[in-house]
Regions:
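Non-catalytic, C-terminal membrane-associated alpha-helical segments of glycosyltransferases
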Residues: 480-562
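N-terminal signal-anchor transmembrane helix specifying type II single-pass membrane topology
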Residues: 51, 56-110
Length: 619
């Protein structure tokens, strides 16, 4: 067939018992005919499944009759009232619980009313769309399949997606979810059978473990019915899909991906269109539909038993509606028992970052992993990690992944973290790990998993231009950087207004102009940051830490000096006074590791004396 196919997929839950995945491929270049492949994957609640594929020429639609318009309008009215009645009398499997999530204050659940309003809104929008676009009367009785190239009208089922054309990629993507009109977004709590729902987002590039990650989450959750898996799958023909069970559901309907198939949503992209994890996660955030909590993980993780109850309990312990639990996950090796329980008492904490390369971009380094200094609650930290992020669902809506950062890998962590802080969110290291990561460095079977930069889309992208956009949006651009960065939707993907970004850089000891950052681990890992900011300045209503008063004046460098640099400088002085070469060698090693001279240039003469004692030249 001529031309390259345009590809857009949507997974739609048509009813509580069935899930439908629509895969649409359209080839341009036909004057009167478009060829459309429509793939429907039906998953029944009993675990059975059926796949239907059709390929047929489709005549270009020229119009619809006035009679059809009248019928559609009447149908829209019937659907709206039917939706209202259904959600009023529906079984409690998808209705709001009368028992809200106990947060800083009690928030009512408005799930049933919200869904009724949403059903009426969708039907009204469909009717309005038909009225607006109705052409002159023409007899056309053939049902038309979804066309990925033609302009798209409203197309949404009760738990499905409204799709729109992405201006940057040309792909059909889900529209962003918006909170119900008149409802406080921070108070919105979605629930299933009284349990708050969890949106689990996985971005996967040709990763055969994506399905194992999803299955692990569903199998080991205490309340699996509340978990909604949203996978952005970037595959080539023959690759294992994120929703593909190891064996057909007809042979084993009890597999997690069969038993809970209606809760697994897959957005399928051609791997050739991939430009890195940022865009994939951007699409993943578009799949969010108002769930109470949002969890973002990589496609090669293993969950522990009861992870859903455990992580929500940890989040509640912060007493902070704006808490985001995030860290670099511990390696899987030696972390999970055969029965699915955690074997670890340690956890990593995000505190070590510095500028790398030229002109210098802030990157996270290796993070310390120890038994928490404060054991009964997640500990406050300055930074955010993409491989594990757990927060209330409004985080996904308010701090959206940027649409326009192709070829950026890891750099988006600084962007999301800084933007989130300016939107009022606070980062915490989890109290205990509820899942673990299989790193390629320790797993031979992962060393041959393809990387996104092999794709044609990645080769066409400009990573340096993306980094200019990323740093400019968070006011971290180098002073002499060219001003030709992409300003597409800069206000949507820029900073928040709850806190000034300059205050974040001040408290995190990040000097943007000098391209330097002080290591914060002595301040963070000791629990000082948590005690000085969380304990002292958490708002009474639990909606974030208050940085408008005394917290703004906190002298973090004084704490770092006391815990880190003062002991090193004292050790250097003792070495010089005693003429102890071994002590000088150890002190110089610490001075180099912590960049003592860079952050305290007044100590350079002392460091030089220690070097002369050691017999080494200054590097």
């Amino acid at each position: 067939m001529p031309g390259k196919p345009y590809h857009g997929d949507v997974c739609v839950n048509e009813c509580p018992n069935y899930g439908i995945m629509l895969s649409v491929f359209s080839w341009p270049g036909h004057s009167q005919t478009r060829h459309t492949s429509l793939t429907a994957v039906l998953g029944h609640k009993d675990g059975t499944s059926m796949v239907q594929n059709t390929m047929r020429p489709r005549q270009r639609r020229r119009g619809s009759s006035a009679a059809q318009f009248v019928r559609l309008s009447a149908l829209a009215l019937i659907v709206s009232w039917t939706g209202l009645l259904f959600f009023v009398w529906a079984t409690p499997s998808r209705r709001a619980s009368a028992e809200p999530v106990p947060l800083a204050s009690e928030f009512p659940l408005r799930d049933a009313a919200r869904r009724a309003r949403e059903a009426a809104r969708i039907a009204a929008a469909a009717s309005a769309e038909q009225r607006q676009s109705a052409p002159s009367a023409k007899h056309d009785t053939e049902a038309q399949p979804l066309d990925a190239v033609a302009p798209l009208a409203v197309h949404q089922e009760r738990d499905g997606f409204t799709m729109e054309r992405d201006e940057q990629t040309g792909l059909l993507v889900p529209t962003f979810w918006e909170p119900p009109v008149g409802v406080d977004e921070l108070a919105h709590v979605d629930a299933v059978n009284g349990e708050p729902t969890i949106f689990l987002m996985i971005a996967s590039y040709r990763d055969w473990q994506c399905r194992d990650t999803a299955a692990s989450a569903l199998a080991r959750a205490t309340h699996p019915r509340r978990v909604v898996v949203a996978a952005v799958q970037q595959n080539r023909p023959g690759d294992v899909g994120c929703a593909d069970p190891p064996v057909p559901c007809s042979e084993d309907p009890h597999q997690p991906l069969c038993k809970y198939s209606s809760q697994v949503r897959v957005y399928a992209m051609d791997a050739n269109d991939a430009t890195g994890p940022v865009y994939a996660r951007h699409v993943g955030y578009r799949m969010y539909r108002g769930e109470a909590f949002a969890l973002q993980v990589d496609a090669h993780c293993v969950f522990v038993n009861g992870w859903d109850v455990g992580i929500i309990d940890q989040w509640k312990r912060t007493r902070n509606e704006m808490a985001v639990l995030s860290t670099y996950l511990t390696d899987l090796e030696g972390s999970v028992s055969p029965s699915g329980d955690s074997l670890r008492k340690t956890r990593p904490i995000m505190c070590n970052s510095d500028f790398e390369g030229s002109p210098g971009y802030l990157r996270h380094g290796a993070q310390p992993e120890r038994v928490p200094a404060i054991r009964d609650v997640p500990m406050l930290q300055p930074y955010w990690a993409a491989g594990f992020s757990f927060a209330r669902g409004h985080f996904v809506h308010r701090v959206r992944y940027d649409c326009c950062l192709p070829m950026v890998f890891m750099g988006e962590e600084i962007s999301i973290g800084v933007r989130a802080w300016t939107h009022g969110y606070d980062m915490y290291a989890p109290q205990a790990s509820v899942l673990f990561h299989e790193y390629a460095q320790k797993s031979s079977r992962r060393r041959h998993v393809p990387k996104f930069w092999e794709s044609k889309g990645a080769r066409r992208a400009n990573g340096q231009k993306s980094l200019r956009r990323l740093t400019s949006l968070i006011k971290m651009a180098p002073p002499d950087m060219p001003d030709d960065w992409d300003r597409t939707k800069a206000s949507l993907y820029g900073l928040g207004t709850d806190r000034p970004v300059d205050l974040f850089y001040k408290l995190a000891l990040v000097d943007v102009s000098r391209r330097s950052a002080v290591p914060l681990c002595q301040f963070v890992d000791s629990g000082d940051m948590h005690r000085m900011l969380h304990d002292a300045h958490l708002r009474a209503d639990g909606r974030g830490i208050d940085y408008t008063g005394a917290a703004r004046q906190l002298d973090v460098m004084k704490v770092i000096d006391k815990r880190l640099y003062d002991p090193i400088s004292n050790q250097l002085r003792r070495a010089v006074e005693r003429g102890d070469k071994n002590l000088a060698r150890n002190a110089l090693s610490e001075a180099q590791r912590t960049k003592l001279e860079k952050h305290h240039p007044e100590l350079r003469e002392l460091v030089d004396e220690a070097r002369r004692l050691k017999g080494a030249q200054r590097s």
